[in-house]
Amino acid sequence: NDASALTALGLHALQHRGQEGCGIVSFDGKNYHSEKRQGLVGDHFTDSETLKKLPGSSAIGHNRYSTTGETSLRNIQPFFADLHIGGLSVAHNGNLTNALLLRNSLVKNGAIFRTTSDTETIVQLIAKSKREKFLDKLIDTLFQIQGGYSLILMTNKKLVGVRDPFGIRPLVIGKLNNSFIFASETCALDIVGAKFLREVENGEIVFVENDKLESIKPFPIQKSRPCVFEYIYFARPDSLIGGKCAYEYRKNLGSELAKETDLKADFVVPVPDSGVPAALGYAEQSKKIFELGLIRNHYVGRTFIEPTQNIRSLGVKLKLSPTRSIIKNKSLILIDDSLVRGTTCHKIVKMLYEAGAKEVHVRIACPEIKYPDFYGVDMPTKKELLAANK
């Protein structure tokens, strides 16, 4: 009966994936219970009184990072609906590329939407399906939606996990004692002491019923197309992706980057925290000194995934501070994991020069990002991307 507490711990481990809001829905065998808040998990779900409002042996949770729909309490997941076959709660990571088209069709046929999130489209399609059994309703829905997604759904009898046919967004399975856990990353399993079993496969539906894990694969087999940004930025460094820690991929990128040019500089400096593994790889390969020329304030959220450009711009100075005595009159190689809009990088370079750096050579660990991402990363237009407008 501590499902909600374990869910809160898992959400805490996944806080890096979204900071706009968080929510948990639990089921006690008879009733569903829901608590949603704007802000961080630790600000709301560490309180025992809040967790007491979420009884039951089943629960799902979600951290919001908006790609569709405004930042507001009504858009915080998991969503809940009472269907004629029983209750349904849904948490969704990703983005549906045909959500607006489906939404307009549903509205024309009498559906009433309470949110602006594409996740509600999934709920409405399941509710509208004329199939009798829940899994059939879900499959009916999945054949209508397009995009990159991982879903966790909870009904009166089942806990269900779904990954899109191309495996764009991640989903893993773990086990704790006799209970199964679905999560976006393995770090959420680690924090509760669960054993990592495997990743959910492309186009696979996994479900737990009567304490047994079962699987169906309704889609034709597709070539795997995982989001490269999971490897580069999103996933926590200690999370496993394809059997390796994200940290290893990032460090290897830094090592390969160092092989491209032989720069003369005093120090290799990472943009913390996401640039640290690549900078370590770069320093190791180039045999240069690694220094923390920037110190991060860990009480400020991740700049890239803040919802507006104005907040992103302010967030850089709130988040990072140069170590002046280290970098003064020094030549630096500044390593970051990626360059999207260029907002953060421009301000960091300016900050380093103002702190006394003699030279700043910027090196980016991942290839140029020239095209929008419509599958769950907030890069909706080409004009926003620095590399696309050089």
Sequence positions of predicted segments:
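Flexible loop/turn segments at secondary-structure boundaries
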Residues: 2, 67-68, 98, 168-169, ...
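Secondary-structure transition/capping motifs at alpha-helix termini
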Residues: 111, 131-132, 260-266, 284-291, ...
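Amphipathic alpha-helical
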Residues: 121-133, 272, 284-302
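Conserved short alpha-helical segments that host acidic/polar catalytic motifs at enzyme active sites
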Residues: 1-201, 207-265, 271, 359
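A generic structural motif
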Residues: 22-25, 292-297, 360-366
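PRPP-dependent phosphoribosyltransferase catalytic core
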Residues: 142, 157-158, 193-199, 218-220, ...
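Short, glycine/charge-rich flexible loops or terminal/linker lids adjacent to PRPP-binding catalytic cores
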Residues: 287-333, 343, 370-380
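Extended, hydrophobic alpha-helical segments in both membrane/secreted and soluble proteins
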Residues: 268, 275-282, 286, 290, ...
